[in-house]
């Protein structure tokens, strides 16, 4: 909505333009009228719409043609004033003033016009009969107001309608020639209907209508008022009411009726509540609310975000099979301008046996978006109507910003639930297969239905009895690490082909260049263990290299099996990411059991000492 309104008064000499302005300001008819009034600003707090309003007079005798064109260009709305007692001033509306204001403008860019019939105190009847053909000819005319500067009749109403024409314009909503909603308005209202239809049955029930009414206007409708609304729709449409609820056609008809009856501010209130601007586009303030992400922190969905998304999943799972089919997913995204997820989705998250998107996979995908691209996540939650449907100020309340990673390392603990693992290795080392194995897919299953490749996979892993999300990001062997942030992650997985004598040297080089002096835990993985092992190029063996650099020995891995691949390596990666402050070697099995044995020995020693003290006291 515009932050201020600029009203320009035009018309023939002596029609009373200046008198109208002075009558509004002085609240009395001026005895002496100057040729032209100075520009007047009405403060926001004294206007009905709480918007500052500038009123500009025009005098043909004092201003040039160029000055007039400048004022027209600055105006938000033009009031063309005529004398109800002089038909010549009415004729000039058609032949002079409207062509001057909007002659070269296209329909969508025309300035709204209010026709003002002044000096109604001098005429018994009305000029509306003569004015109506002009209003029908020019669609930019919002309304016509008959008034009297002398009697102060309809003066404030005149400027209210002028304000309204700017703040709640008809032109973007309604085509008066076709007598129907414009396509952009119809699309916006259809989206609003679909968001408000919380059980996805294509009907707004009384409860849904009242929730909608309260959300937009602050109060629910009284039961009788609700029945009256449905009765009006039922009488005027063939399919507007169904099962005692409002259909989409009924909802669109109701808004058309508001506009036709001059109550387009009602439709604008609805549109603006759902984030639309004057061009019927969702505003940046709505889609991208202010959100600060400090360096070293990450973003995760919180319980509010997950609850909201789970409700929407269940709403669109029409057959209640616990998965979204392609058609159901398309319906889910019908409130978006375009489909935000491509076919690579099915190689990014877990799917059902039939290849459909499960609830688990659905929530994993949203977790991935929230972590990798928080701006896009906010945008998507905005399209889904999160602030309105969750009764929150903005979609930022569906997200949590984690503590800075540096502090986690200092304190030796973290509250984070999502971790990023970069998977690095030479071409052909098995990185893509490793990512797909994380989704439970063996090499045979991957070959049967390859699908669209994805550089990411995400799944959940249990770490010390807690569920964590682990994101695997496959880094191409051709990737150039130009800055430290390119290698940044929570854990690095360096994968090499056990059967390729040159494969390990690539991983060793990457480790020494980018990870050796960092605090990022690293895990080496020897892939394709089902193939004969090849001797690596001269130098340290993989096991010796890991020992030298205080790393756990390479983990042996193969996804060439009949059943789903093993998950131990992914648990190991998630554990390393969760506890980066521990020495990586401590993640090895031998070290773990050594610590268990030491702990048991210490416990036994304390117990024995305590026994001796107690025995002595006896």
Curated annotation (Swiss-Prot):
Binding site for GTP 1: 16-19, 59, 118-119, 121, 149-150
GO terms of molecular function: calcium ion binding; GTP binding; GTPase activity
Keywords carried by this UniProt record: Calcium, GTP-binding, Hydrolase, Magnesium, Membrane, Metal-binding, Mitochondrion, Mitochondrion outer membrane, Nucleotide-binding, Repeat, Transmembrane, Transmembrane helix
UniProt binding sites for GTP 2: 428, 430-433, 528, 530, 559
Main localization category: mitochondrion
Binding annotation for Mg(2+) 2: 432, 474
Organism (species): Gallus gallus
Subcellular location field: Mitochondrion outer membrane
Chain positions recorded as Ca(2+) 2 binding sites: 317, 319, 321, 328
Domain spans labelled Miro: 2-168, 416-579
A Pfam family: EF_assoc_2
Reactions catalysed: GTP + H2O = GDP + phosphate + H(+); ATP + H2O = ADP + phosphate + H(+); UTP + H2O = UDP + phosphate + H(+)
Family: Belongs to the mitochondrial Rho GTPase family.
GO BP, one annotated term: mitochondrial outer membrane permeabilization
Gene Ontology, cellular component aspect: mitochondrial outer membrane
Protein name: Mitochondrial Rho GTPase 2
Positions annotated to bind Ca(2+) 1: 197, 199, 201, 208
UniProt-listed Enzyme Commission number(s): 3.6.5.-
Role according to the record: Atypical mitochondrial nucleoside-triphosphatase (NTPase) involved in mitochondrial trafficking. Probably involved in control of anterograde transport of mitochondria and their subcellular distribution. Can hydrolyze GTP, ATP and UTP.
Annotated EF-hand domain residues: 184-219, 304-339
Ranges per topology, Mitochondrial intermembrane: 615-618
Membrane disposition: Single-pass type IV membrane protein
